[in-house]
Amino acid sequence: MYQNLNSKTSPSSETSHKISLVIGPTEVADVMTGKVVTLSPHHSFNDAANLMNDRYFRHCVVVDNQSKVVGVISDRDILRALARNPNSRSKSLDQIMTPNPITVKRRTPIIDAVSKILAKRINCLPVVEDDGSVCGIVTSTDLLKSYQQVLELVQKQGR
């Protein structure tokens, strides 16, 4: 029904690590979810809905057979499809997913990811390798958690 991709992590530079200890995470790799559950475009609406419900996911990355990102399916996509047509349950993901989503790379600065999410009014960005294969996902929740860490560090330093 779905596949788990192992995280393809690469060590951060020593400088980046020191900076992140002082001011918090600085790159998408510092805050992304690295083990991504993916679906293929041919999976069914029900496959996605059941997976997302069982795992408490709000988003799933849709990939082709080379693990290249071709879409994202969200809980909103599922609700929208049902609202438009109660018979949507028989559709495949390629009919209801958001195709060709905006992506980022693991070394993308967090501020750039935040800017993309805000500008496009989206809630997640698949993280891809140079070859376009998925290696993670960063969500608005991940970014808020990182912001919270920075605020907590600033607050501690102010005491």
Spans of model-derived segments:
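Tandem CBS (Cystathionine beta-synthase) repeat/Bateman regulatory domains
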Residues: 1-159
